[in-house]
């Protein structure tokens, strides 16, 4: 999906960097710094946008749920690097779902989809947090990083309840561990996750 269409922008109005699982490798950070260096006058916002059913997050969820399946990926350094980073977010999402719905939530038919949705939302928040810290480290405190999840099935950008920023309607990243914990609760208790679990 062209990002320009999602945000109703024209060609070249946005500087877009696409990467599996929203990973912040050297190439991605280099691309962001290029934009900061050469487009600074017009750059106002850094948006980290995940999407429902993300293939990289789905693969990490499957590795989490079925660790033996991870063995086929473990010999591929590049794929393993993506999944290893995402497994941290997946595990955090799994813990929040268990805390919210009970440990037997893993037996519910929609658990995999709920875990993917929660992990995608947590992942973009974590990446936005990291980008915001990088911007602050460069003295670019006027730039903000925000995040959201594009839902392919509804063609809308979703953010966890109570996190939307005005006027962007995207979410600010958490600022500390307590804020990450609160965000995890908001994601787990959201209608999106409840729907995936058939509640």
Regions found by a protein language model. Give the residues of each.
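Gly/Ser/Thr-rich loops at beta-strand to alpha-helix junctions
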Residues: 1, 50-57
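N-terminal short beta-loop-beta anion/metal-coordinating cradle
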Residues: 1-16
């Amino acid at each position: 999906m062209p990002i320009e269409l999602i945000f109703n922008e024209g060609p070249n109005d946005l500087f877009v960097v696409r990467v599996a699982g929203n990973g912040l490798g050297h190439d991605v950070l280099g691309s962001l710094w290029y934009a900061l260096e050469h487009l600074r006058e017009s750059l106002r916002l850094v948006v980290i946008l995940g999407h429902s059913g993300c293939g990289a997050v789905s693969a990490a969820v499957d590795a989490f749920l079925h660790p033996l399946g991870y063995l086929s990926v473990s010999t591929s350094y590049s794929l393993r690097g993506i999944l290893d980073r995402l497994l941290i977010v997946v595990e955090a999402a799994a813990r929040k779902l268990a805390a919210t719905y009970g440990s037997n939530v893993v037996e519910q038919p929609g658990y995999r989809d709920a875990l993917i949705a929660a992990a995608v939302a947590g992942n973009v928040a974590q990446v936005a947090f990291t980008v915001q810290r990088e911007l602050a480290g460069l003295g670019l405190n006027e730039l903000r990083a925000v995040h959201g999840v594009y839902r392919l099935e509804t063609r809308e950008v979703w953010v966890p309840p109570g996190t939307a920023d005005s006027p962007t309607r995207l979410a600010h990243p958490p600022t500390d561990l307590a804020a990450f914990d609160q965000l995890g609760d908001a994601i787990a208790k959201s209608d999106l996750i409840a729907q995936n679990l058939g509640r």
